[in-house]
Amino acid sequence: MAPWLQLCSVFFTVNACLNGSQLAVAAGGSGRARGADTCGWRGVGPASRNSGLYNITFKYDNCTTYLNPVGKHVIADAQNITISQYACHDQVAVTILWSPGALGIEFLKGFRVILEELKSEGRQCQQLILKDPKQLNSSFKRTGMESQPFLNMKFETDYFVKVVPFPSIKNESNYHPFFFRTRACDLLLQPDNLACKPFWKPRNLNISQHGSDMQVSFDHAPHNFGFRFFYLHYKLKHEGPFKRKTCKQEQTTETTSCLLQNVSPGDYIIELVDDTNTTRKVMHYALKPVHSPWAGPIRAVAITVPLVVISAFATLFTVMCRKKQQENIYSHLDEESSESSTYTAALPRERLRPRPKVFLCYSSKDGQNHMNVVQCFAYFLQDFCGCEVALDLWEDFSLCREGQREWVIQKIHESQFIIVVCSKGMKYFVDKKNYKHKGGGRGSGKGELFLVAVSAIAEKLRQAKQSSSAALSKFIAVYFDYSCEGDVPGILDLSTKYRLMDNLPQLCSHLHSRDHGLQEPGQHTRQGSRRNYFRSKSGRSLYVAICNMHQFIDEEPDWFEKQFVPFHPPPLRYREPVLEKFDSGLVLNDVMCKPGPESDFCLKVEAAVLGATGPADSQHESQHGGLDQDGEARPALDGSAALQPLLHTVKAGSPSDMPRDSGIYDSSVPSSELSLPLMEGLSTDQTETSSLTESVSSSSGLGEEEPPALPSKLLSSGSCKADLGCRSYTDELHAVAPL
């Protein structure tokens, strides 16, 4: 060989040795540099290298940013998926590389890289969001994509990875996974590395529950291993990162205990690791909910008892409130025991004392509520004040037998006291009648019996004034609190006036003033106080009736004006032909009775002249009776039934047009059946004296001048026969103004 050839070979050999050592150092250094560089995350980085195209830049995060993965287009699976494995901090780290598919690449906004252990539930996720360029095209289909490194992976463990493009119409489960297995420790690290040597694991790892605490006990390694403390990693099964608890190794015992306090119940993954990461053991433990001592019956009792106590207090409060309301309403019922005993002891003596006779006059033009008040007031006078009351609503038999006007005159003459219940209707019609009478005209309201009664009472009042002032005490005018003193007619100004129920004690004393010598001083005043009158059922019934009248007035303040406002009379109706009867001149009463049960009453009575009589005789008869015949022949404008003429004709009438009793009582209901509440409140002894069959009472105030209606049980033959010799009361009514 030529010398120059030998010289060249030696030169190349030396050069190769020198360059080889440098290349080896460079290769090792670059590997270590790569390991140091790839163990950390990059926020933004290029996704392709040496592709000949523009770089694609992604923004990386750990799937915390929520982007809707569902789209409207199909994006193909990732292509050419490869796994790059290397060691980071003595553990396995991998990087995923792939290329995008051509289908739907123009709609691609990013990727999600999901890494899971095959036989465990651990899951790691990375999200790559396309930053530059904003949109890809088919020229990028061979561009390589690269994920961030996945750290802290186990040696020789099976994993799978999914690269899911988004937004895609396909679901995550529709993309195929890529399976791989991590390499062994000695392939990724040096064989003499401690991490690759077999490591010691505790033989026993015990977990126990103490209330809401969890205690982990394990036997530690021998002292020659050099372990100073252990790390206890724990988390719920479906939570994210582990929580760590440091447990110091106990030197005096062979076991070490670590207490986890106030842990929530659930399924836990517990991992024991030593300080050099050479000892690791994993366990699963289910921590049960803690049953409080207040659970079960104790809790039920603890809940029920307060509810019962609260309900009891609420019930007691309600009862007290209602009792207070009742005390406010019936405050007059509260009487001292001594006063009650005095009142009870006084009752037998009062039964022996004569009961003053009282005649009650009232208006029938103030509605049914006012009539209820009057009826309750009559019962109250009889029950509580110890009076014998004459009320027409109670004695229809006497009215039918004697005649209404005759009955009124008789009761005015017999009664010791005459009480006129004044009201708006009475004031209006009495004043109107007097005005029409003075003016010579004939007004509405004629035929009402209370007008006749008031006129007779006024005449008696004038006579009493002329005789003696003591005789005036017989006449009393009362009005309730829904009326006023102005409702007292002017012709009754001489009478004693009382407002009820404010002046109830004075009224009771007035009614018993004639037997002051028999009673103890102040007895009736105490008995008739506002507090005492609620003690009886009749008093409470009167209270209710007054309240009903107040309510009616509040609902219709102008009820009286609506009912009695003057209006143009309607056209005269056709009147049925009159059948005249002529006979011997005697006056007979023909009573037409409505067939029905025993409670029915006589509906219509008219007088007939049975002989030819001249007009002068008729006029003479009417003047003596105090009647206005011409006014009687016309119907009243206020809607009340007209008086039937005493000496005229007989006309046939059907049951439908027969006049009723104008408010004294309803002919369809027996007067013995009272429609007001609590009327049974009369005491036994007073009920005996005020029974409907034996009482002298009947009202003067509400009836019309009709022949009296007899109960049908008294009319066995179907007709009523009146006395032929009807005596006249012209001597009693000689000064009464004609109606």
Curated annotation (Swiss-Prot):
SUPFAM superfamilies: Toll/Interleukin receptor TIR domain (SSF52200)
Extracellular side: 17-299
Annotated SEFIR domain residues: 355-509
One GO BP: negative regulation of transforming growth factor beta receptor signaling pathway
Pfam families: IL17R_D_N (PF16742), SEFIR (PF08357)
Membrane disposition: Single-pass type I membrane protein
CC annotations in GO: Golgi apparatus; Golgi membrane; nucleoplasm; plasma membrane
Impact after mutating residue 468 to L: In HH18; reduced activity
Effect of mutating residue 162 to R: In HH18; results in decreased expression at the cell surface
Protein location: Golgi apparatus membrane; Cell membrane
Region (Disordered) location: 614-635, 650-719
Keywords: Cell membrane, Cytoplasm, Disease variant, Glycoprotein, Golgi apparatus, Hypogonadotropic hypogonadism, Kallmann syndrome, Membrane, Receptor, Signal, Transmembrane, Transmembrane helix
InterPro entries xrefs: IL-17_rcpt-like (IPR039465), IL17R_D_N (IPR031951), SEFIR_dom (IPR013568), Toll_tir_struct_dom_sf (IPR035897)
Residues of this chain annotated as glycosylated in UniProt: 19, 55, 62, 80, 137, 171, 206, 277
Record field: compositional bias (Low complexity): 667-702
Tissue: Expressed in umbilical vein endothelial cells and in several highly vascularized tissues such as kidney, colon, skeletal muscle, heart and small intestine. Highly expressed in ductal epithelial cells of salivary glands, seminal vesicles and the collecting tubules of the kidney. Isoform 1 is also highly expressed in both fetal and adult brain, pituitary, tonsils, spleen, adenoids, fetal kidney, liver, testes and ovary. Isoform 1 is also expressed at moderate levels in primary aortic endothelial cells and adrenal medulla, and at low levels in adrenal cortex.
Residues exposed to the Cytoplasmic side: 321-739
Molecular functions (GO terms): interleukin-17 receptor activity
Reported effect, residue 306 to S: In HH18; reduced activity
Signal peptide: 1-16
TM helices/strands, residue ranges: 300-320
Function of the protein: Feedback inhibitor of fibroblast growth factor mediated Ras-MAPK signaling and ERK activation. Regulates the nuclear ERK signaling pathway by spatially blocking nuclear translocation of activated ERK without inhibiting cytoplasmic phosphorylation of ERK. Mediates JNK activation and may be involved in apoptosis. May inhibit FGF-induced FGFR1 tyrosine phosphorylation. Might have a role in the early stages of fate specification of GnRH-secreting neurons. Inhibits TGFB-induced epithelial-to-mesenchymal transition in lens epithelial cells.
Disease involvement: Hypogonadotropic hypogonadism 18 with or without anosmia: A disorder characterized by absent or incomplete sexual maturation by the age of 18 years, in conjunction with low levels of circulating gonadotropins and testosterone and no other abnormalities of the hypothalamic-pituitary axis. In some cases, it is associated with non-reproductive phenotypes, such as anosmia, cleft palate, and sensorineural hearing loss. Anosmia or hyposmia is related to the absence or hypoplasia of the olfactory bulbs and tracts.
Binding partners and assembly: Interacts with MAP3K7. Self-associates. Interacts with FGFR1, FGFR2 and phosphorylated MAP2K1 or MAP2K2. Associates with a MAP2K1/2-MAPK1/3 complex.
Designated name of the protein: Interleukin-17 receptor D
Name of encoding gene: IL17RD
